[in-house]
Amino acid sequence: MDNVRKIVLLTIMLVSNSIVFSQNGETAKKLLDEVSIKMGAYTNMQIVFSTSLINEEAGINEGDEPPHNGKIALQGEKYNLEYLGNTFIFDSKKLYVINHDEKEITVNEDDLNEDDGFIYPSKLLTFYKEGYNYKMGKLINMNGRKIQFIELIPIDSNSEIIKVDLGIDQKTKHIYKLIQTGANGAKTTLTINSLKSDQQLSEMTF
């Protein structure tokens, strides 16, 4: 997935930029920690989301394809994710994948990972804690909400992900949008359309 990085003067500029980036990074990390504490304090969450893809290299431009909708229930390490025609149920020990089209169930001994370069909704609260540098991005008004973006840059220069722009609702401290730019320039956008916390969940959910 390619994108979206007189000697004395140059030295001064580099030093100045590194100081600003460090301060900027501390501010960004503080906000991320606030989000993690706020959302992590809920007993559970039910999230409805949509994803969209732009990949000009593959001829997929903005608006060419309808968004894919999904929903997820999260409780601690457990989750029930419905996405792309599959249901993923993780009971904190095993992952059950139900393929409704093929009418088959597979069982994995571990959780979903990002080996395919995609950040799954189940990882929203934890994916950034390791392997990224942070800096504050733009503050944008979206649908009447002030969304503060944080730019996350992978430390691994060989990562399939070039950067992740994480949009946080300034008022609620909830994650609203995630825009992931791949090494091939493809952009995957995940938007949280609704979030409910501390709901009464059935025992059969996980």
For the regions a protein language model found, what residue spans apply to each?
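Beta-turn initiation residues at beta-strand->coil junctions
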Residues: 51, 99-100, 179-182
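Bacterial Sec-dependent N-terminal signal peptides
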Residues: 1-28
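A short, surface-exposed beta-strand/turn
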Residues: 68-69, 73-75, 89-91, 164-177
